[in-house]
């Protein structure tokens, strides 16, 4: 039954959606697909430019990856394509390793994603802390804004100055700020105003479309000297073609860290988008199949001139709001973009760079989650705030690879510290006949019996709690009550073995009370139960105390 459930997780949602498909839903899917394509067009171009590649690469990604991920995906409504989350990391890879380096890293990331899906890792993404995803998402938003300041203000850099890192871009921006263009600022400001106001005026039309149109008209008919996409890139309306890069072991080795980061980021973004979509349509996605589809989509995108892709929350939400309910909508979105590529791509060269920067400013604002960021700073535990700020700062100052790696390690260490603080060992209060005002329910114990109650998980971070157990010379029997110990690892087991040796050297019998299932399995498998003696493991404290009293009686 479990195996059948896992196999169902690897079934494309398209096959399920087509079972009860009808003409009415087809019309809705086609309409939604066309609308989403209109939204995706300027975004794909802008995100491609932010990623340091040509504008057509963004369209290729939305076409190829978008189609494959919709056809094979585990979500009925997911729309995939280039996203802002990848912009800075892709730009860094292209600057350092060129397009072939990016293609290799993306293909490897696709392989990782497929393996993650086949190994049923879809549910494991939930173990990545919310503070890390919020931290690096906010960090990416800041890096996007910093990266677009140059084009928004029309600043010119001296020949040979091509900053790659975010800090280098910020330094170059301020050093050359005197070269800013008022014309660029006017176009960028108007575009930004349209992007902000359009949602309130044009309910059904994405703000990026009128912003692009107005930007083109301003540059075309007003005496404004502003750089356009056509000034910086060669525009082509040819369809994507297959390109397999030459690669060797050295190139593959260099690409592995970036590939891992792309894979993890794609998994997080896509599954987060699926969860949001599930809430909007009251559905249930198949996380493992979605990862496989993301992998296949990224491999296809890389081979056909695209960049890394993942599920896009904004485009997915637009698909749902416009009636899309099956993967057909995502496939129509890709087909529509093919038509747009052939017919309208030459006009893309007329789009002003300040307009592209304005679009990316809004994208960055929408993804930065600043309200969540501030809320966490105000209300989260100190350890979570440390992880949040560390991940955010490392994303901005260094890159996403460093941020995720150090963020995860730091989160794990702080979690271990927190869990170790929850584990404690308490000695039972010793009472005798001379102790006044003793509660009737307390059991008076012989002096020779000592009871310690352990609370919390016994693992390597809390193993030293065993050292708090004090063995008196007059003790004949030591009882460890473990009803509140849910887990035990080998480090803590080693500490218990050392305690056993101390007890043996002093002639003390060690008795265990109420050992839970997981700790008992560890003890049995390691031979610890045989070492202590099966008779010294009791189901509850009453049985353990009775057993201890028999041991004392026998010793007399």
Enumerate the language-model features and the residues they cover.
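The feature marks cytosolic C-terminal regulatory regions of anion transporters and related permeases
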Residues: 366-531, 549-555
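Transmembrane helical cores of multi-pass ion-transport proteins
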Residues: 5-430, 474, 495, 527
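Generic hydrophobic alpha-helical segments
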Residues: 90, 170-173, 466, 470, ...
